[in-house]
């Protein structure tokens, strides 16, 4: 297991930016590919990290680097930063919804999933894991992601973590079991 500490977070130096974080994720995947060329890769992202993980997966798959990505865990994900802006500020009279061109980050899991599906390689299996009492991400976001997986014919599992808030999905036994079962399924011959 490798946990990436993006620039500007935890003990990493530098300033966080979408481009920098994407470079960090790419460097981590390049390291894993050279150090562990036969490893089973499973990328996991929570909330905005799901957008980062799906974008990293798309880039890795498009570059045709071994080992392939076997799984993508998207914990409390949303479709895109822009869709969250609209979800959080739906009122047309508020100026926030018109500010999407000025967002500093534009991660879009829907676009990343399309890139994965269209890459012509074996796509990873996806685990969608929403928290049913998520106070940040509305249910429409997970519905849109699930529909995107269906539309793209991506293999996916969905596990709703009952009663969990936004950051609680994997601190609950149900979420932990869902992740363990997903990884077991990927590892089965």
Feature-to-residue mapping (PLM):
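Membrane-embedded segments
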Residues: 1-31
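Alpha/beta-hydrolase active-site loop signature
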Residues: 6-10, 79, 165
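Gly/Ala-rich beta-loop-alpha elbow adjacent to hydrolase catalytic centers
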Residues: 45-49, 53
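Hydrolase active-site cap/lid region
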Residues: 55-115
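Short beta-strand/loop motif that positions the catalytic acidic residue
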Residues: 120-123, 127-134
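C-terminal catalytic histidine-bearing segment of alpha/beta-hydrolase fold enzymes
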Residues: 136-189
């Amino acid at each position: 297991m490798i946990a990436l500490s993006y620039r500007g977070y935890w003990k990493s130096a530098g300033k966080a930016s979408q481009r920098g974080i994407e470079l960090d994720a790419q460097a981590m995947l390049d390291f894993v590919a050279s150090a562990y060329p036969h490893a089973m890769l499973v990328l996991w992202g929570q909330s905005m990290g799901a957008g980062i993980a799906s974008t990293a997966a798309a880039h890795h798959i498009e570059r045709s680097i071994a080992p392939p990505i076997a799984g993508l865990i998207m914990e409390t994900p949303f479709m895109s930063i822009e869709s969250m802006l609209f979800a959080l500020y739906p009122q047309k009279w508020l100026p926030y919804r018109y500010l999407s061109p000025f967002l500093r980050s534009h991660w879009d899991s829907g676009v990343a999933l399309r890139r994965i599906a269209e890459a012509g390689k074996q796509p990873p299996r996806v685990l969608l894991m929403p928290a049913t009492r998520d106070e940040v991400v509305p249910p429409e976001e997970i519905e849109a992601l699930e529909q995107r997986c269906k539309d793209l014919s991506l293999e996916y599992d969905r596990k709703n973590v009952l009663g969990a808030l936004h950051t609680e999905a994997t601190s609950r036994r149900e979420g932990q079991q869902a992740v363990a079962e997903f990884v077991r399924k990927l590892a089965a011959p």
